[in-house]
Amino acid sequence: MNHIRNFSIIAHIDHGKSTLADRLIQRCGGLAEREMEAQVLDSMDIEKERGITIKAQTAALHYKALDGQVYNLNLIDTPGHVDFSYEVSRSLSACEGALLVVDASQGVEAQTVANCYTALDLGVEVVPVLNKMDLPNADPDNARSEIEDVIGIDATDAIPCSAKTGLGIDEILEAIVHKMPAPRGNPDGPLRAMIVDSWFDPYVGVVMLVRVVDGRLVKGERIKMMASGAMYNADNIGVFTPANEPRASLEAGEVGYIIAGIKELQAAKVGDTVTLIKPGTGGAAATATEALPGFKEIQPQVFAGLYPTEASEYDSLRDALEKLKLNDSSLRYEPEVSQALGFGFRCGFLGLLHMEIVQERLEREFDQDLITTAPSVVYQVVRNDGEVIMVENPSKMPDVGKMSEIREPIVTVHLYMPQEYVGAVMTLANQKRGVQMNMAYHGRQVMLTYEMPLGEIVLDFFDKLKSVSRGYASMDYEFKEYRASDVVKVDILLNGEKVDALSIIVHRSQSQYRGRAVVSKMREIISRQMFDVAIQAAIGVNIIARETIKALRKNVLAKCYGGDITRKKKLLEKQKAGKKRMKQIGSVEVPQEAFLAILQVED
């Protein structure tokens, strides 16, 4: 065990984490030169395109150190984006050390800090690395002082490197071997292995990525999941080098995979402990008595409705979501029915990027055509009888008379930016009802801390933050508490009928404005009918905005040249009566763009 090192790489998006991983794999001969490609650990197309890492991947490498010994290095790649922080904490809990990669030309950014704190909380040894030293504008001294100021770890011997040119790779490998501790665990004890990740493979079923803490696992042994109690045969075990390399056994301290012919992913929950079954007890007794401390269940923060464009596609959307859930344990979904859109699902996501990626994967990998409703957050509603209920969907909000208060989720937001953009960012945060808690200068970087309602962030805060700061600002947020607030539900009515999928929950101060904006946007989108269509925005029974789409009508007076006015009146009255009758039985089709229009209403 003394020759094993488990480590991961922490970095902000685009600071060169995946490229550094490629270099380490290449240097240790993990893949043949011809198999080497850029971002070898990012296996999804969407990861390569967006240049982000979503799923954690692993690689087992052999490194011959300068002291002549051969070490087994297990690299566990982590995502950098704040939406995937759950994947990060899982990856880190399987490691003893982490490389903190900071772009020497940009310095420390928000998500680096968030993930680094996660690592320090888990007691992981952090080794700072300054990447992109080959750039002409690299400023290692500034980056070092930022690491010390913002994160508070000693960066005097941070290793300068360039993942692109290969500079400093050997120094990094030496630091991994000498600075990071060997795994702790009892190699002779009963088997306990933690499931770090699991995903579904169409050929072999569920593949579990495990970190063996105590004991050893031999191919073909009977294993048991401690949380679910399910039992299987470990048919195939091995390690990823990133390619699969089957092994006869996995020892304590190693990170590898188990394939046990599991059909449904619920059986192999991430964070569960795998142990052996004592031979001869018929599966009654497991060898280990207590499970490893798992991970906390993650709560989705953002909810949206996903509906198939064709009602007949409902079943295939359900299958697609089930398959996606196999690879993404943080996705939540449940069926829901909307009068406007038919049958679909209410899905819970960790954040906006997560939502976008799930949507894109559904469309790309499973050929789904989707209608997505506006994202919303979970509100706490206190009823008149004192009962507290959680409302995920605006259309499920009780009537105004039946509740005493609504509490909205408040998050603490950390914003990092160069000091010339502070004014613009502060203005934006104030527009979003943010309350400034703190402001700190670190060299030329400024860190602002705000408390803001999550509902204000989910729509477009991130996009606007990037545009007011020309892309330099970065943010992360964590949930703080629920707080009573004056928020109201705005319903959109078409000819007096509520369209449930268009309801939005907004602060009262913005309700009039938002209502008017949505209504006028809808007027542009809905095509003219044979009868007048009234589009209204209402809070409870009070109408706050209205637009009318005038009817298409034939000129019934075209055939009257001269003649008496009463003749013309009669024809007009007759047309009017027909339109009125049509309006009673006619229905208005709401096009897909109308649901997206809500997302584009500017503040």
UniProtKB/Swiss-Prot annotation:
- UniProt domain tr-type G: residue ranges: 2-184
Protein name per UniProt: Elongation factor 4
What GO annotations for molecular function exist for this entry? GTP binding; GTPase activity; guanosine tetraphosphate binding; ribosome binding; translation elongation factor activity
State the membrane topology.
Answer: Peripheral membrane protein
Which Pfam families does the record match to this protein?
EFG_C, GTP_EFTU, GTP_EFTU_D2, LepA_C
Q: Name one GO biological process term.
A: positive regulation of translation
- Which residues are involved in binding GTP? 14-19, 131-134
An example Gene Ontology cellular component term from the record?
Answer: plasma membrane
**Which reaction(s) does its UniProt entry say it catalyses?**
GTP + H2O = GDP + phosphate + H(+)
The protein's matches in PROSITE patterns, at most eight in alphabetical order, are given as: G_TR_1 (PS00301), G_TR_2 (PS51722)
- Subcellular location field: Cell inner membrane
Which Enzyme Commission number(s) are listed? 3.6.5.n1
Q: What class of enzyme is it?
A: hydrolase
Q: Which UniProt keywords apply?
A: Cell inner membrane, Cell membrane, GTP-binding, Hydrolase, Membrane, Nucleotide-binding, Protein biosynthesis
Protein family per UniProt: Belongs to the TRAFAC class translation factor GTPase superfamily. Classic translation factor GTPase family. LepA subfamily.
Role played: Required for accurate and efficient protein synthesis under certain stress conditions. May act as a fidelity factor of the translation reaction, by catalyzing a one-codon backward translocation of tRNAs on improperly translocated ribosomes. Back-translocation proceeds from a post-translocation (POST) complex to a pre-translocation (PRE) complex, thus giving elongation factor G a second chance to translocate the tRNAs correctly. Binds to ribosomes in a GTP-dependent manner.
